[in-house]
């Protein structure tokens, strides 16, 4: 999932390391969905266009769903390039959530580069960096400090939320439309009552405990008629 725009980009005016004098294309990267018990982990890579400013960029966690949706469309329309990627539940269970998050971010940067937008510098939210073929650095709380990372956090969050809303259509009794897979009391109650779906992360302790009792949901058609 990507879109690019061919345009010359000068210094972006974002937070940069002091060792970088001029960055023509700064790529912000962030992920969404490390903590949930269900669903993929998503990541996005964004290179903003300094000639097309986007007002209201901020850490996706402090924005309302409506604001995120509006900004999602503006980012996709205004950015020089962007790419959204994910790592599946199966990959999360196979290599653990940290490495799956790194994989999703790596895929996002690779997808951006494959579309023709080659970053000079990649800045990643957090304290760890994925392996990419470009200069990369981690920025703690980068989603609140660097506009390109804020934009990436919004794309990743909205894309993941949309995926969980699709799961809600298949499994309405789990309440994915309200908790989006995160470990809330409502989600724990649904797991205890209905068991784990194929979309739950089996390596996560609350899900593993349910599975150990043989509580498995395999088909969405088994949902209660309400």
Swiss-Prot record:
The keyword Flavoprotein does not apply. It is found in: Cytoplasm. It is an enzyme of class 3 (hydrolase). InterPro entries: RNase_HII (IPR022898), RNase_HII/HIII (IPR001352), RNase_HII/HIII_dom (IPR024567), RNaseH-like_sf (IPR012337), RNaseH_sf (IPR036397). Its main location: cytoplasm. Keywords: Cytoplasm, Endonuclease, Hydrolase, Manganese, Metal-binding, Nuclease. A divalent metal cation binds at residues 30-31, 125. GO terms for biological process: DNA replication, removal of RNA primer; mismatch repair. It catalyses: Endonucleolytic cleavage to 5'-phosphomonoester. Its cofactor is Mn(2+); Mg(2+). GO terms for cellular component: cytoplasm; ribonuclease H2 complex. Transmembrane segments: none annotated. One of its GO terms (molecular function) is RNA binding. Manganese or magnesium. Binds 1 divalent metal ion per monomer in the absence of substrate. May bind a second metal ion after substrate binding. Disulfide bonds: none annotated. Its EC number is 3.1.26.4. Residues 24-216 form the RNase H type-2 domain. NCBIfam families: PRK00015.1-3, PRK00015.1-4. Belongs to the RNase HII family. PANTHER family: RIBONUCLEASE H2 SUBUNIT A (PTHR10954), RIBONUCLEASE HII (PTHR10954:SF18). Endonuclease that specifically degrades the RNA of RNA-DNA hybrids. This is Ribonuclease HII. The gene is rnhB.
